[in-house]
Amino acid sequence: MKYDFDTIIPRRGTNSYKWDTPEEENVLPMWVADMDFRTVPAIVEALQKRIAHGIFGYTKVPKAYYDAVVRWFDDRHRWQIDPRWIIYTNGVVPALSAIIKALAAPSDKIIVQTPAYNCFYSSIRNSGCELSANYLVYRNGRYTIDFDDLETKAADPKAKILLLCNPHNPVGRVWTPEELWRIGDICLHNGVFVVADEIHCELVYEGHDYTPFASLSERFRQNSVTCVSPSKAFNLAGLQIANIIAADEGVRRRIDRAININEVCDVNPFGVIATIAAYNEGSAWLDALRKYLWENYEYLCRFFEQRLPQYPVLPLEGTYLVWIDCRASSIGSDAMTLRLQEGQKLMVNSGTLYGPGGEGFIRLNIACPRTLLADGLERIAHVLVQNF
């Protein structure tokens, strides 16, 4: 079946955070991490059938939901999940906050490999904990982990949790099994618990493989929890559904209690139905989506090579979020994003949003029809050329 990712679907006037936050109609948003594509037809059909029923009371999560999650991760990623390990919740960010509150005390340190997803910082701050930054090393156009520094950070008695982002947002790395083994061994040796945010796990490109951290060994499985969701891969963020995979029963009880205390345990019927449909019937659509996203990335790379060669585009191993090195510009990334918005009516994210190490970079969402991507790149070129 051929899927259409080229048609522009108008999103203004739908209360879209991405499209309706800018007040001016001609602003092109390439910032928030959701996609400008219609989701899987089978998901739409399942939701329409449920809506036609007309009653939307409290939701019980059925066995079919757990079966769909278990089957998907076994078939796609060779990860065998016991359904008892699954804790459903209404989003990965609420899950991260609940996990930190369950497993760390105020003033404890949380290790983050920076630059990193901005909500990591708010989850740490809102839990009364302290950030411990393990800076990623940017060398020869690629990021790697500073394992010596990670050893030092993990050896701190106050360090309790490592927030692992895989695939990594915003730098686009998909950590290799070897890298994950080193992370896991360091954390085990120092009594640091791994919280793996793997929400982008379905969006990995040819030549790279997503390895669930918890799948590597029994020891890692017991010393970690994993947060996953169909929201990024299937464009379902507004339905607010996610899962925490926690193999250790004691850890699971603590997290479950924190989720209930923080009142993020209830999910809506549409998120449940969409998850079942996505995992049972979305595989072919997802494969077509990944192909289209990769072609978008190749288009962007050609554009920069021809028009903006002084600004390196980082390799995209996973996610649909491109990290661009703009340090050759005469202005910082905050000023650049402001000029893009005010002068070119284009919204992208400044690297400073992602914490230490992000200055001088911008993040660009390429999950859109290619005509919109081409429009956005022309707007970027206007500012980058002027400020070189």
Regions found by a protein language model. Give the residues of each.
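Helix C-cap/helix->beta junction micro-motif
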Residues: 127, 157, 189-190, 220, ...
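Conserved core segment of the aminotransferase class I/II
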Residues: 45, 218, 222-294, 302-303, ...
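N-terminal small-domain helix-loop-helix segment of the aminotransferase-like
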Residues: 2-91, 98, 278-279, 387-388
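Active-site phosphate-binding strand-loop segment of PLP-dependent enzymes
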Residues: 136-208
